[in-house]
Amino acid sequence: MSQEEVPGEIPGDIAIEKAENTVQDDVEAKNTSETKKTIPPMLNVEKVDVAAVGEKSPAPVSVYDLFKKYQKPDVKSDSEDMNIGFDQLTTDEKNGFLRKLQMLTVGNKKTLKVPGESTPSPASRLLKKFVPSRRPSTENKSCESPSRFSLFGKSNKKAPELERPMNGGQPRKKSARRLNFGKEIEERTETDFQNNRVVAAMTREYEKIVTLKGVPVPINKPPRQQGPRGSLETPTDSPAKTETSSISKSYGSDYQSSRDRYTSINEDSLTKKRISTPNRGQGLSNRDNATWHGELPPRDYTSPTFSRKIFVGGVPWDITEAALKDSFGEFGSCAVEWPGHEARYRNAQSNTASLNLRNQSKYTGQAATGYVYMIFEDERAVASLLHECSQEIGGAGEWYFKIRAQRSKSTEIRQVQIIPWVTSDSMFCEDESLLEVGIEPKRTVFVGALHGMMTAQVLHSIMEDCFGSVECVQLDTDKFKYPIGSGRVTFREHGAYFKAIEMGYLHVHTSKFRKRVQIDPFLESTNCMVCTTELAHCFCRNRNCFKYYCHTCWAVDHGHGHDGEVHVPVIVPSSASKAFSGPNRRSHLSSNSPSKPASLMSSSNSQVAHMVSPAYPVLVGAPAQNLSALYGYIQNSQQMMITPAAVYEPPMTPSPNEMKRRSFPEFQPQPTVFFNSTPMMTPQKGVPCSDGSAVPAYYANSAAFLTPPSSYYNSPSHSTSSNLSPQQPQQYYGANLYYGYMPQMSYDGGPNQSAMHLPHTPNYQQ
């Protein structure tokens, strides 16, 4: 063999040796793939500059590069090295990838990118667990096309360590785009740049939000942080600005600026809608625009005392009374109170046709409104019911119970909401001495349309956040000590009182409900503040007036409307509206918007109470059909129908068998009802008792409706008091209403006698 033939034999031997090494690598890779997890080729681990960043600190990357490496449109489906999509990953690999993605987005430190240098690989830390990085040899790079394993840094075992190329003593960095599976790099067209601009912009926005907040959040949804109690949003002089309460200001300017920066332009928030709404009138510029955002605190009680009455929401519309008693009767004797029959609506239901509509229906007692009230004989039954209910962790007083509703061929299981009431939640005063001294009516406002989950402490926090320091909060309850949706709030300062009166309405937004709470001045029975001689009939809540008026003075001051402002009169109740010191004081009233007709009033926003005490007879005058006539906001254009007969519905109408079998108070015979068609003026003058006994000054659980005073019918356009009839409508500001008290009446028996006799009819014209 000559020396010229030796160079010819070396390539053949090298080729055979390379072929053996390739077969050996294929066999080893096959065995390795069976024991190790399959790694997507697109997540290629490239060599990291260890001297620059360290072995345990790979070069920082961006989310954009990581996303782009998962999308390779230049690889065809028939290619051997086709990318494995995200849907081909196992569950563990998906979870690991998502964790690494979060680490890259949250803990990323941006570095300066050198022009002309490719972006480092984004998945080096992820694949470092599975495949060790190996440097490919020069011979493999020049003589062979890279296999699928060479993409992960794998090379022939017999490649000498000294033959690996070095650039300045440092390993050469490569990226997945530069490798491109051994193909030549193609220049990206202008279309590719246009398509990637949107993705790049979204990625940069995502990284900004993540870096600011510390956790991944959606891009198009602005983060809304809630304080421990809430925040208030009210309009200012400029329609494009809003101001927040002290609670919302505590978050600082950083939160406000970030919230404005990352709010989507396509998302119209409630605040923007309220700002863009034009004012309804100059006098009502601040009304119906304040909103409180917050969360109800979790309730925690020690040995609570529950009301025997509970709210049951979400019941089927065709459920029967028998089905309800069958579901709740296992906890104790109970009765059903249907919507519209409770105390706060009973006074206004003078139309007998609407009352008999339920009895004429196919389903006797159908709950068309979707809720009912259950009244138990013993409060311990309520505690037993709550033990069988499910409750959300950290809930604010909502419970859930499953009832059975019988269908034609099957039995339906329906989950309903239970809202109990703890009697101690009806009052909240920071200073207990106020219960003995009494509240100041000149700093007290009336609130109506309260939600059933709003306790006195919750209302105290809301009003204090919105308007100022609150002294005491009292909620009105019925004879079962269940709230009727109204209450009174006493402020410490007059400034907070006037601010609440000027606001008029307050929107309460929580994760559980949204409610529009009404705020009115707490009125007293007093004389007109203009003439100081006549009794006041109405109250003007406009800040320029803010005084009591009689009929004559109101017509003189507001007859022409020279100032161009809106002056809405609020009807003054009777003399019983004076503040009473004690926990049993109840107002039992609410008011409604003047623009809202009575036919469209929802039962949840029309709270008018009529508390009937079984121990005393009730004097009832002509009841008003319009609920807004009972307290404020009666316009001159509204028509009133005066009926000559009083309509009274008992709390429940059980069958005679039920009345015999049960003996608790709500099934006792209804009290005696008297109708007096004589016009009455307030305050009333009672006839002194024959035996000199004291006349009862008030009854905490009763009220009465009275006809208009005779002085009102002094024009030809109005009817006289002698020709009142159901067929003849008349214009009327509103009915005189006893504000939770009975008129003064004398009884034949003394105060110590157990038997009650019929009262003498007092002469109200004295």
Swiss-Prot record:
Organism: Caenorhabditis remanei (Caenorhabditis vulgaris)
Record lineage: Eukaryota, Metazoa, Ecdysozoa, Nematoda, Chromadorea
Any matching Pfam family: RRM_7
Domain RRM: from-to ranges: 310-332
Record carries keyword RNA-binding: yes
GO BP term, pick one: negative regulation of cytoplasmic translation
Region annotation Disordered: where it falls in the sequence: 1-35, 131-179, 216-299, 578-602
Biased composition (Polar residues): 233-256, 276-289
Gene Ontology molecular function: any one: mRNA regulatory element binding translation repressor activity
Protein name per UniProt: Cytoplasmic polyadenylation element-binding protein 3
Gene: cpb-3
Cysteine pairings via disulfide bonds: none
Gene3D superfamilies: 3.30.70.330, Cytoplasmic polyadenylation element-binding protein, ZZ domain
PANTHER family: CYTOPLASMIC POLYADENYLATION ELEMENT BINDING PROTEIN CPEB, CYTOPLASMIC POLYADENYLATION ELEMENT-BINDING PROTEIN 1
Annotated keywords: RNA-binding
Compositionally biased residues, Low complexity: 589-602
GO cellular component: cytoplasm; neuron projection; nucleus; synapse
Function summary: Cytoplasmic polyadenylation element binding protein that binds to and regulates the translation of specific mRNAs.
